[in-house]
Amino acid sequence: MSTSFDFFNDTKAKMPHLAFLRMKEAVLGKRYDLSVAIVGTSKMRELNRRWRDKDKPTDILSFPLSETEGEIYINPTEAKKEAKKFNRTYDNFILFLFIHGLVHLKGYEHGVIMESIEQRFRKKFGV
């Protein structure tokens, strides 16, 4: 069974591709097909409005397509704003968000259990 890790950057923001691949494999496994799209504010707002009925951009969205396939969308502009609120560097916060999205794809919802799982992976990757 072949799997894929597709990475599309539709912005000028720099992203840590290799770290994303390692994190994806640690959280979801090597057999999980993942597409990551780095998108601008208008595209993220459109996605958030369509799928969450929220008419504003957000920093990350994750969509499980099946048990072994999903998509993550990251908006670097919103991530940069949020990084300051969490007292993190931009690069660190992008990885923080990515772990968050991966854990959602694993099937977890916001709460104590999800936070515990995220913390374990953040520690593993120094995030």
Where are the regions a protein language model picked out?
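An acidic/histidine-cluster motif and surrounding catalytic segment
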Residues: 1-94, 102-127
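Histidine-centered acyl-transfer/condensation active-site motif
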Residues: 98
